[in-house]
Amino acid sequence: MTKKLVTEEMRKQWLPVLQKESEAIQPLSAENVTIRLMQNQAEWNAKNLGESDAPGSVNSTVGKWQPVLIDMAKRLAPINIAMDFFGVQPLSGPDGQIFALRARQGVGDGSTTAQARKELFMNEADSGYSGDGTVQAGDPSGFSQAEIEGSGSVVTTIGKGMPSTDAELLGTTTNPWARVGITVQKATVTAKSRGLYADYSHELRQDMMAIHGEDVDNILSDVMVTEIQAEMNREFIRTMNFSAVRFKKFGTNGVVDIAQDISGRWALEKWKFLTFMLEVEANGIGVDTRRGKGNRVLCSPNVASALAMSGMLDYAPVLQENTKLAVDPTGQTFAGVLSNGMRVYVDPYAVAEYITLAYKGATALDAGIFFAPYVPLEMYRTQGETTFSPRMAFKTRYGICANPFVQIPANQDPQVYVTADGIAQDSNPYFRKGLIKSLF
């Protein structure tokens, strides 16, 4: 009698495991990020504003800045472009640390230092490393040179599992184990500041209240906070475009000429081809990072219009996003979703026609650049030493740095403390950029 491959006892034992749904990864959502920011704001308010309760029933008519600042911090968080393109990691202090855990081959590869050992999970896996030791050569998919190019004699090698006779000798001097290990490397992110100042006369305050019924304090507060946020958005857009690598599959040196590099009789056909171009370059981001394909698009208004006119852009989600405060009419704007699922944002100040692709994963740890807000808003109030005119200032503190796998080179000594932010031109594989010529 032959032994059953699967018995009823096996089924009873493992069926609950098979039927149990895997728990979904809970990312650090935009709501959680905003909660951390408001907590930082509340802690700063308590330590620095110096607002105390007035005696008795006077409390009900005394205006305070604490709820105003918290409300401003809540309002600013959703319209920050970093929430859509960057990983967001709020700081709980002026300095923070980010870590990169790198898996590497062991000493068996002949290297003498940890940082010189070949890194795992970054390129194609060496199919012979844990097996028969065959050195990989040829095409990574297994095709010969003749099959790909039509001629040639190069044949692709295939690493296989080792035979039992070799496996029985693992650990001996003639047949050592293939070894792997890890290195943990760290970098720092330091909060930097922005600040604006304004003063006004008592006469202006009195006249604005008497004639227009407006509080100058509130008006100037909105002006300064909105300007700071607008400047931050422009910093993030410029940083993203500065550090993105250039298109690799289309165009020349990151410049795509619609008239020469894209085939099509009519402008509409060429505009439709833009989506395929985006898809190919987005796949390239996935190959370079091993994290995922590009899923965000930042482009000039005319490029977005070309995609819309070709029927590739669905504008319906814009109305839904309005209710989630995902649209910033004074900075970047959410335009819609492409037919391949990419979310499209418009750079309203763009002069050159361009497209920048970005990858952002499901969690705040999975992105090419990290935005690290510390104190959303710091407010200072005083009076002129001779004029006694009211003065007001706002500051914000935040840090920005590249993903540690980008800013820490593969051959960096694990014992060396990295203090640079990793923002360098044409260096971040989580982003790809291309200039578009002859769009119309």
Swiss-Prot record:
Location in or out of the cell: Virion
InterPro entries named among the record's database cross-references: Gp23/Gp24_T4-like
Disulfide bonds, paired cysteine numbers: none
Pfam families cross-referenced by the UniProt entry: Gp23 (PF07068)
Any one of the GO CC terms: viral capsid
Keyword Repressor found: no
Keyword annotations of the record: Capsid protein, Late protein, Virion
Family (UniProt): Belongs to the T4 phage major capsid protein family.
Function summary: Major capsid protein that self-associates to form the icosahedral capsid.
Protein name: Major capsid protein
Species annotation: Salmonella phage ViI
